Every structure is written in structure tokens, then in C-alpha cells.
């Protein structure tokens, strides 16, 4: 199985800029990518596509400055192909095993906000259209092409890290992940007084 992981290295996760510095966001993005790679390694040949040079041990990195849709559609005819987003740190081998075992010409794993977090295409001819409710667009596209589409439903694949509420999910469910350990290291924790909420400890300079 070919596995494509798109990755944005420059100014990643801008919606977290109110609680993370640019350097912290870059490191979080890098570690989430490594978490995804760790989960996906047993299932096939991984290729990371990025608009700039990137050093990731053990996987092929391709530099492509095109937009996401153009980048992914360039390789869609290499089906069977899986496209997995790089900001899904809660993924595990168990979750991906179930994903890859799901029958269908097209398997779509939705995000919590209507996006497509993972996509598995087993037939040539399919084209992606990310952003703006892509989950529904991909299901409709498969239907129009006469392809059998299946929805893969998993909490752990639905959590893509974009804002503070997503970080809360990572801190509650991501123990053992590289990204989780990084957030703990820079002072993040979860308060369980009444409604769970994200907290950050401030380290005083000596």
C-alpha cells in the first residue's frame, strides 16, 4: 500500500498562535507527523510531501509547492493509495489496521468539522477536493463515479489538531505520543475540575 502524508512545514497550525509560539507550533507539527508515521509504518510505503525541504528518517520526502489538491491528485492514479493527514497524533496501528481492512473502492475517514482526515482509494480515476466539507464531496464524487464508498468512523482518526479544543483532546487521550510528551514538557496539562480544560504552567526564568 502506498501511503501519502501531506505536511506543511512553514507557519503550521496558525490557529494555535494565541497559545503557542511559532517555534512551538513548528515542533508540535513535526512531532505529530512523526506520530502519524509511527502508526502507519507497518502498512506500506510512506511518502511525505512538503512544500520545502524536510529531513525525516526512514521515509521518502518529496518537495512539491503545489496546493494540496493538485499535489494529491498528481498521484491518485497510483491506486491503491491512502492519504493520511499529518495532524492526527491519536492514530494507532490498531486504528489503521481497521481502516485498511475496511472494504470499498473509496474509504473516507471524516474529521470532526466535515473534513477528510484519511482517504483510501482502491481504483484509479478518483480525484480529491479538500477543504470546505470535503468529507461530503468525496462521498458524492465516489457515487458519481460508480465507486463503492464506505465511511470509516473512529474518534482517534477524527481528531485533527487545529485549535485549543483539539489540544485538549490530545492531552486527554495521547499519552505516549511524541506530540503529547512535547506539550507536557512545555507546561500543558488538563484540569478536571468540573469541565476538563487545558492549562499551561509558566516556567519562571532563574
Curated annotation (Swiss-Prot):
Gene3D superfamilies reported for this sequence: 6.10.140.50, Spore Coat Polysaccharide Biosynthesis Protein SpsA, Chain A
EC code(s) of this entry: 2.7.7.68
Root EC class: transferase
Pathway(s) of this molecule: Cofactor biosynthesis; coenzyme F420 biosynthesis
Reaction it catalyzes: (2S)-2-phospholactate + GTP + H(+) = (2S)-lactyl-2-diphospho-5'-guanosine + diphosphate
Coiled-coil stretches: none
Gene Ontology annotations of biological process type: F420-0 metabolic process
Record has Hydrolase as a keyword: no
Keywords from the UniProt entry: GTP-binding, Nucleotide-binding, Nucleotidyltransferase, Transferase
MF terms in GO: GTP binding; phospholactate guanylyltransferase activity
Reported function: Guanylyltransferase that catalyzes the activation of (2S)-2-phospholactate (2-PL) as (2S)-lactyl-2-diphospho-5'-guanosine, via the condensation of 2-PL with GTP. It is involved in the biosynthesis of coenzyme F420, a hydride carrier cofactor.
Family designation: Belongs to the CofC family.
The protein's assembly and partners: Homodimer.
Protein name per UniProt: 2-phospho-L-lactate guanylyltransferase
Amino acid at each position: 500500500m502506498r501511503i501519502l502524508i501531506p505536511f506543511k512545514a512553514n507557519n503550521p497550525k496558525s490557529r494555535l498562535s494565541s497559545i503557542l509560539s511559532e517555534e512551538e507550533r513548528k515542533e508540535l507539527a513535526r512531532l505529530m507527523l512523526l506520530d502519524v508515521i509511527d502508526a502507519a509504518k507497518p502498512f506500506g510505503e510512506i511518502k511525505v510531501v512538503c512544500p520545502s525541504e524536510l529531513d525525516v528518517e526512514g521515509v521518502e520526502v518529496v518537495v512539491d509547492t503545489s496546493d494540496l489538491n493538485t499535489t494529491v491528485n498528481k498521484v491518485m492514479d497510483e491506486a491503491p493509495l491512502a492519504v493520511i493527514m499529518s495532524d492526527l497524533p491519536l492514530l494507532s496501528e490498531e486504528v489503521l489496521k481497521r481502516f485498511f481492512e475496511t472494504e470499498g473502492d473509496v474509504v473516507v475517514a471524516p474529521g470532526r468539522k466535515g473534513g477528510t482526515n484519511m482517504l483510501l482509494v482502491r481504483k484509479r480515476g478518483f480525484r480529491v477536493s479538500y477543504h470546505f466539507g470535503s468529507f461530503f464531496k468525496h462521498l458524492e464524487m465516489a457515487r458519481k463515479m460508480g465507486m463503492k464508498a464506505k465511511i470509516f468512523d473512529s474518534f482517534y482518526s477524527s481528531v485533527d489538531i487545529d485549535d485549543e479544543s483539539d489540544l485538549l483532546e490530545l492531552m486527554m487521550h495521547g499519552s505516549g505520543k511524541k506530540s503529547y510528551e512535547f506539550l507536557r514538557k512545555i507546561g500543558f496539562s488538563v484540569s478536571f475540575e468540573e469541565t476538563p480544560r487545558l492549562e499551561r504552567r509558566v516556567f519562571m526564568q532563574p
